[in-house]
Each structure stands twice: as structure tokens, then as C-alpha cells.
């Protein structure tokens, strides 16, 4: 059994086909899905989907790309809905200097506000980080409660920084890029990381793994990510499935599935 720890079933590419996507994934051993929001509208839909489907859980939050035009009422809505029993995390939140370099201050402000909500509610955080490794680390180190957990989603940083994040009680999640031929950093991390700190995800509809690279991604493709990690480590596929399943259940407090 495996869990897709990060998927956008609320995306326009997937939502119209949501039942067949869930069914195909379940046929391939996917037991549960964390449907992740990135603004208020997508977070509302993530929560609606989680309410409709027993095997789907929601993460709600505001992505750094929304920092320049989010409203205070969005944060108020977020806080008001964090107690819903199907909400399992705040995310995705973080910093992205690749697309949004000109709004660093607003991104940091939004990131810190949502970390503070996580500290208050004890919900784990799902962190988006792109071209912002040092600033992301410094904010987490200085603003996240020591015992608050979370995950570095679709981790794109270096192996050298992995210990910095895991020392902050954060997991590292690998996605489709670990299967890409020249993705040296994800492959190095897959080989070296302590399995007790590893999660897997599709980030669908994005980042489809080989052999479906460039196509619309979905949870049924999680098996290719598991297979690649197992191959890189020289272990059985079941070893990766069992470890990441247990880690995901623990992080998101999913209980018995």
C-alpha cells in the first residue's frame, strides 16, 4: 500500500475525471490521497473533495505565487477551516523565487503568517521551496515551533541541506523528477536519506515520472517513483512502500485507513 502525499485533484486537469483517477490509483495500491490547495478557491475545493471521498484528505493554504494579491479574509477563512476533521495540513506554503522573485517580502510575510497558524493548531505544514533554500530554512528555523512537523514537498534542494531540514522535524518528499535521467540531486537523496524521513508524491497533474514524462500526471504513476527509489537503494519495492506509508500516516495523523 502507498499514499500519494501531494496531489492536486482540485486542478482543472484532474477534477473532471476525479473518480476514474481515484479508481485507477486504488487498483495500483494507492490507499489514500492528500489533496493540496494553493489559494482560497483551490483550498475550498480540496476540502469539498475530501468531504466527498473517504480516501481523500485535504491540505489548505496559500502558495507563494499568491503573495502579491492574497487578502486578509483569505487568512481568516483558512484559520476558520483548519479544525475540519478532513483537513490534515496547512499547505502548500513557502517561498518561490523562480517565478516570483520580485515579491520576496510579501512571500516571507505570507509564509510566516501560515507557519504561525500551524504553530497554533499543531497541524503539519507542506512546504513549497524553489530557488529559495536559505531563506526557507531560516524562516522555518526561526518561526516554526520545534515540535511542529511538516514536509519539504517535491524537494529540489541539495543533499547537503537535507539534514538541516530533517533536524527541524521535517520530512523530505520525492516526486517524478527522481526518475529523470539527469536529475542527480533527487537520485542522490533517494540513495542516502534515512527512510524514516522519506515521503513520496506525484504532484499531479505535474511532473509525470518516466515513462510518462511530459504527460498529465496522476496517482497511478506513483509506482514508478517507488520502483526508482527502490532500485537506487538496492532494496525491495515493498521496503519503500511500507516506510513511506507509515511516515505519511504518522505525519498527517491519518489513523487507520
Regions found by a protein language model. Name each.
Residues 1-257:
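Mid-domain alpha/beta scaffold segments of enzyme catalytic cores
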Amino acid at each position: 500500500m502507498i499514499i500519494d502525499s501531494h496531489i492536486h485533484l482540485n486542478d482543472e486537469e484532474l477534477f473532471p475525471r476525479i473518480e476514474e483517477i481515484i479508481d485507477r490509483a486504488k487498483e495500483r495500491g494507492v490507499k489514500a490521497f492528500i489533496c493540496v490547495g494553493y489559494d482560497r478557491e483551490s483550498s475550498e475545493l480540496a476540502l469539498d473533495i475530501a468531504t466527498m471521498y473517504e480516501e481523500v484528505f485535504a491540505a489548505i493554504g496559500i502558495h507563494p505565487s499568491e503573495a502579491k494579491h492574497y487578502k486578509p479574509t483569505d487568512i481568516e477563512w483558512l484559520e476558520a477551516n483548519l479544525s475540519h476533521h478532513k483537513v490534515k495540513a496547512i499547505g502548500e506554503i513557502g517561498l518561490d523565487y523562480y517565478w516570483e522573485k520580485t515579491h520576496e517580502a510579501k512571500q516571507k510575510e505570507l509564509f510566516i503568517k501560515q507557519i504561525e497558524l500551524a504553530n497554533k493548531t499543531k497541524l503539519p505544514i507542506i512546504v513549497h521551496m524553489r530557488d529559495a533554500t536559505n531563506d526557507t530554512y531560516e524562516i522555518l528555523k526561526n518561526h516554526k515551533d520545534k515540535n511542529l512537523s511538516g514536509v519539504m514537498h517535491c524537494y529540489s534542494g541539495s543533499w547537503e541541506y537535507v539534514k538541516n531540514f530533517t533536524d527541524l522535524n521535517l520530512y523530505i518528499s520525492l516526486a517524478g523528477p527522481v526518475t529523470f535521467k539527469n536529475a542527480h540531486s533527487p537520485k542522490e537523496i533517494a540513495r542516502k536519506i534515512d527512510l524514516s524521513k522519506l515521503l513520496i508524491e506525484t504532484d499531479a497533474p505535474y511532473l509525470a515520472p518516466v515513462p510518462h514524462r511530459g504527460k498529465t500526471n496522476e496517482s497511478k504513476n506513483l509506482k514508478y517513483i517507488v520502483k526508482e527509489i527502490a532500485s537506487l537503494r538496492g532494496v525491495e519495492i515493498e521496503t519503500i512502500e511500507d516506510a513511506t506509508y507509515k511516515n505519511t500516516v504518522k505525519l498527517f495523523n491519518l489513523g487507520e485507513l
